[in-house]
Amino acid sequence: MASSLGVLFAFLSVLHVVVSHGASPAQMYWESKLPNTPMPKSIQEFLPEADYSAQGGSKLFLASGGVLKSKTFSYKHAGTEEELAASSNADIFFFEHQLIPGTKLKVQFSNTISKAKFLPANVAKSMPMSSKDLPQILARLAINPASAASKVVSQTINDCETPSVSGEPELCAASLEQMVDFSLKKLGNQIQVKSTEVEKVDRAVQEYTIQEGVERFAGSKTVACHAKNFAYPMFMCHAAATTRAYSVPLVGANGSKVNAVVACHTNTARWNPRNLAFQMLKVSPGSTPICHFLPEDHIIFGSSN
């Protein structure tokens, strides 16, 4: 499906971009709202160019083409037999007590960051994001309603509309400004922001060893923003008071180094009882904290208080 979507999206461009050496509006917004918070490399990859002008009248195009395909999972969904079989050779989920130096985990860190950029704030605000507006959304994106691309868009919109299983506040953000505003509203202005950084991408599953220096870096409140599959960068951000975030240094069997971010969910009682995590770890909902690494294109905001 990815290749067919790529052919479609390669012809689309949301903005006529004029290269400039200045800071983009999104970057300036970050610096004004979070002046003492370094911007993670993963967010920098999504920043639009410094100068741009919208083209195409009422038609909305893509930021820079390409299919945005991220490795993610949903707490709301049951894991299929196919997913379980495909995940059997990697430690996608693990326990919090394993976060100690010397622990070995089989992990795949694949670079899922796309060349597509965040929408400008005004464009993101103007884009509808509800199932009832699906025909309008597909029309603005020039997507055939019968295509595979339409199914991707429809599924993500549905995910954005479906209430959180735990009642946590959620927002689907298509601009950096939306992501920052949501995080500030939920956490206050004393914030740390981190994402996984991989020194050398090895797309194969390999064994990584946890090194000295594991640290819990956020307070009791976090906002996690997970990249979704969509026609342009879209992040599902959710506020949580039951997630512990860790910075975990790793070294792979091939010598590659990773500064990984780990999220440990302490309350899984309301997750789908057939969720892939429960099947892989052979535990029941709510019985124990469940942890996972964050892909490179996922971000965690944490209160530093």
Report each predicted region and the residues it spans:
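Intrinsic-disorder-preferring feature that marks N-terminal prepro/targeting segments
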Residues: M1-Q178, T196
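Folded, disulfide-stabilized extracellular/luminal domains of secretory-pathway proteins
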Residues: V123, M127-P128, K132-N305
